[in-house]
C-alpha cells in the first residue's frame, strides 16, 4: 500500500503506524508525565506539607516532557506530511492529527527532487528532499525507495 497520495496539487506522505504496544507505552508515559507531578503536588498540599518551588519546577519539566511524548505518539499514530504546490511557492506542513507544525515555504523555481537513504541499508528506505538551490525541504516520513521514486516522477510530470 503506498504511503503517498497526490491530489489537488498536494502530496500527502503518511507515516506507517508503529506497533500498538509502542504507541500504548508512549501514550501512557505522556499521560503519566502530565498527571503524576500534579497529583503529587495536590497530595502534598492536602497532607499539609505545603507548596514548594520544586513542585512548580517538576510540573513544568514533566509537562514539557509529556508534551513531547504526546507529540511523538501522535506522529506515530496519525502523522502525515502535506506538500502543497503552487506556481510560485511550495508549502510544507507536518500534521500530527491533533495539531500541525509551522509551515515551511520555499520558492518553486529550479526545483530538484531526490531521495536520501536513511536507516539500515538492507531496509532500502529513504526520505524525500526538495531543493531549489537556496532552501531545502527535508521530509521526515521514511518510505521505501521505490515509492519515493514514484513520488518524484509524479511531481516532475505534473506542472504545478
Range-by-range predicted roles:
Residues 1-19:
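Cytosolic juxtamembrane N-terminal segments of multi-pass membrane proteins
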Residues 16-80:
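Alpha-helical transmembrane spans
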Residues 1-7, 153, 157-160:
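Low-complexity, intrinsically disordered extramembrane tails and loops of integral membrane proteins
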Residues 10, 82, 88-89:
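Structural motif
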Residues 3, 80-82:
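Short, surface-exposed charged micro-motifs
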Residues 74-80, 87, 147-151:
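Cytosolic juxtamembrane helix at the C-terminal end of the final transmembrane segment
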Residues 23-36, 53, 95-104, 138-153:
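Extended intrinsically disordered, low-complexity coil regions enriched in Ser, Thr, Gly, Ala
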Residues 17-19, 75, 89-145:
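Non-transmembrane, membrane-adjacent beta-strand/coil modules in membrane-associated proteins
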